[in-house]
C-alpha cells in the first residue's frame, strides 16, 4: 500500500507550477515600411542565438507568415513562452520563394527586420541586440530595412 501511495505523495508535494505546462503567449507583430504589396512577411521567434536571424535555418523556432498587402502589416505569433528571452527576425518575401534572396556577396535583396529594430553596421543583427523578455499579449514593432 505504501509503495502505491508514495508516488502520489511525492507528486502532491511538488509546487503546482512544476506540474502545469509552461505558459505561452501571442506576440502581436507590427511591421512598418513595406514598399510593395506583394508577397509574404516571414517571421521567426528565436529562444537562442544559435541560428538567429535565419528563418530558413531556424530549427526549433516559432514561425509565422502574413500577407504583405499594405505598408503596415499586423499579425500574431502564438505559442511564445512567457518570461523567455526571445528575438524576432523577419523578411518580406516579395517573390514568395520561401527564401530570402541575396546579392552575390550576401547582402539581402529583400527587406529585413528584427525586434528592437536591431541592426549592425556590417552583417546581420545580433541576438543580444534583438532580445527581449516575452510578456503576455505583447506588441513587437519592427521597421523593415532595405539594402
What do these predicted regions represent?
Residues 27-33, 43:
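A short, amphipathic beta-strand motif
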Residues 36, 69, 82-83, 136:
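Surface-exposed loops/turns
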Residues 93-101:
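Acidic, glycine-anchored loop motifs typical of Ca2+
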Residues 16-23:
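Sec/Tat signal peptide C-region and signal peptidase I cleavage site
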Residues 84-94:
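A short, solvent-exposed beta-strand micro-motif common in secreted/extracellular proteins
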Residues 111-147:
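Extracellular beta-sheet/turn segments enriched in Thr/Pro/Gly and aliphatic residues
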Residues 42-46, 87-89:
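Beta-strand signatures of extracellular beta-sandwich domains
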Residues 33, 76-81:
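Short, flexible loop/turn segments at beta-strand junctions in immunoglobulin-like
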